[in-house]
């Protein structure tokens, strides 16, 4: 039987969550360099949970400087099987006002200045992205959101861009 290990990639505010009682900070190195920051190991009831601040504690890494490969590899070294990524983003849709949580089921990567693969010159591999999210994780997120009485929407598409400002209104037609 597989024991799932959860990691959350998100903002630095989760370091201050009171429910995270037992805390251990882990330093890891990867073949792709160092991850964004130390990884927080904690427990939620009896389950291990890991947290990695995408931009580093203190928010010192801009989106274009995040070492995604090192972040994912570090979590893999810890035996993480499931990752939930939480982001504060803008929306071009009126029915997605500020504060509404979206459980995405698709994404579009419109970035252009970062490495997007673990497979470099020596390995050629094709990874299907037809269904990039896990129904099990989406269901677990939805249950937690319902318990917290947060306004949310199930299913949506996240579009990643290579700049730090919000997109133009015409971007909705891309």
Regions found by a protein language model. Name each.
Residues 134-166:
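Active-site rim beta-loop-alpha module in soluble metabolic enzymes
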Residues 122-133, 159-161, 171:
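Polyanion-binding loop/helix "lid" in catalytic or ligand-binding cores
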Residues 2-129:
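Metabolite-binding pocket within alpha/beta catalytic cores that recognizes anionic/polar moieties
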Residues 165-174:
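Single conserved hydrophobic/aromatic residue that forms the stacking wall/gate
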